[in-house]
């Protein structure tokens, strides 16, 4: 599965191993390819001469599926709008300047990110879900000084402004009636803002690890992917389904 590991799935781990079964999750794009990049960065840093417990580390991982040709809404849907809206109603947890940062809503934690693409481009980014458990998953040493650590979503510049009315309404939704209204919004967005058969999509993924000491950068590496859809299919479908199929084949 390309989905995050659920508590129910995690609880089956011992039972599956005893039965000789492999339950494989988080092997799509995000989560998936981003995990590979993160592990490579951490191992590269650990093996470098610059690795030192006196360093201050900053880790970011931003991923987003966006229209290749920007539209006024600054977004198009390649999957259920309900999932996107539900994520916007969820809090996030990350590290910012050595302190735990909790965002009640993504738009309240929005920042700007200059992606180091061949043609540099600025995006809007925000933390997604709970980033902190991934420090252990990516094998950050417990004695490393981690200044910033965030896994988040990436959007086109102007996204927050275009979605202002959406944010305002989401803040008012509560209980079963709120879920019903979110379902209605999802249907409306799918009608108005879904990708058409000839609409090219784009996926941008940036994963970076930087080490500083006394304010000077001593080690820095970033992995970047900028993929576009074409006549053979969308970039999102390719980058999610191919890794899953490779995992199944393995």
Describe the residue ranges of each PLM region.
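Rossmann-fold NAD(P)-binding glycine/threonine-rich loop
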Residues: 2-23
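Short gly/pro/ser/thr-enriched loop/turn and capping motifs at secondary-structure boundaries
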Residues: 5-10, 30-34, 66-68
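C-terminal catalytic/substrate-binding lobe primarily of soluble NAD(P)-dependent oxidoreductases
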Residues: 44-250
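Active-site-proximal alpha-helical scaffold in enzymes
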Residues: 35-47
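A broad detector of short, well-ordered amphipathic alpha-helices
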Residues: 14, 36, 242-245
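Glycine- and other small-residue-rich loops at beta-strand/loop junctions that grip anionic moieties
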Residues: 2, 26-30, 34, 123
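General beta-strand structural signal in soluble alpha/beta enzymes
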Residues: 23-25, 61
């Amino acid at each position: 599965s390309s989905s995050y590991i659920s508590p129910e799935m995690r609880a089956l781990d011992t039972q599956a191993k005893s039965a000789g079964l492999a339950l494989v999750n988080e092997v799509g794009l995000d989560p998936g390819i981003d995990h590979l990049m993160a592990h490579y960065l951490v191992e590269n840093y650990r093996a470098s001469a610059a690795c030192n417990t006196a360093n201050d580390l900053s880790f970011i991982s931003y991923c987003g599926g966006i229209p290749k040709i920007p539209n006024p809404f600054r977004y198009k849907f390649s999957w259920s709008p309900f999932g996107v809206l539900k994520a916007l109603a969820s809090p996030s947890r990350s590290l910012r300047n050595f302190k735990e940062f909790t965002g009640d809503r993504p738009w309240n934690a929005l920042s700007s990110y200059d992606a180091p693409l061949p043609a540099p481009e600025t995006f809007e980014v925000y933390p997604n879900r709970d980033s902190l458990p991934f420090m252990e998953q990516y094998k950050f040493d417990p004695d490393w000084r981690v200044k910033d650590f965030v896994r988040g979503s990436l959007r086109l510049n102007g996204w927050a402004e275009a979605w202002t009315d959406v944010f305002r309404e989401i803040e008012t939704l509560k209980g079963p009636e709120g879920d019903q209204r979110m379902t209605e919004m999802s249907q409306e967005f799918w009608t108005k803002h879904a990708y058409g058969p000839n609409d090219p999509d784009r996926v941008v993924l940036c994963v970076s690890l930087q080490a500083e000491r006394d304010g000077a950068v001593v080690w820095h590496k970033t992995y970047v992917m900028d993929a576009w859809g074409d006549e053979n299919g969308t970039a999102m479908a390719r980058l999610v389904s191919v890794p899953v199929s490779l995992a199944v084949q393995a």
